[in-house]
């Protein structure tokens, strides 16, 4: 069984500008440099105004994770996330994310939407987290989900700041 977590942000910029920044290779590299942890990397990247596909690697320290999760983590703990986005009409983008956590009984996936809203835009992400550990899986899913929501907020803030510095 998995648990769902919802994230929502309302950037002041239109969806096309937010999309362009979110999938920009320079922005992704800068974001990973600041937020990605040890051995963070942009592993694959292709993007244009209609479509984007990229794979990123985050390196995380087990001691930075909740205690309920630590015993299940390898010492070289990393997360590999593949995102694909496509333009879905004027001012609308739809995306999917698949998250691989090698060496753990956990995985995650997500559906993403970005659309124009008023003078800005709205970003919505629904993440499904599954941890296959008897009796503790639900508690670990809650911990991992909370960490994902924090990371999404930090990534959004970084991207919006990057946009303002690179306008």
Residue ranges and their predicted role:
Residues 18-22, 125, 159:
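Hydrophobic pocket/interface hotspot
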Residues 61-88:
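Helix-adjacent hinge/juxtasegments
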Residues 86-87, 137-167:
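A conserved amphipathic terminal alpha-helix motif
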Residues 30-37, 89-92, 104-105:
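Short secondary-structure junctions
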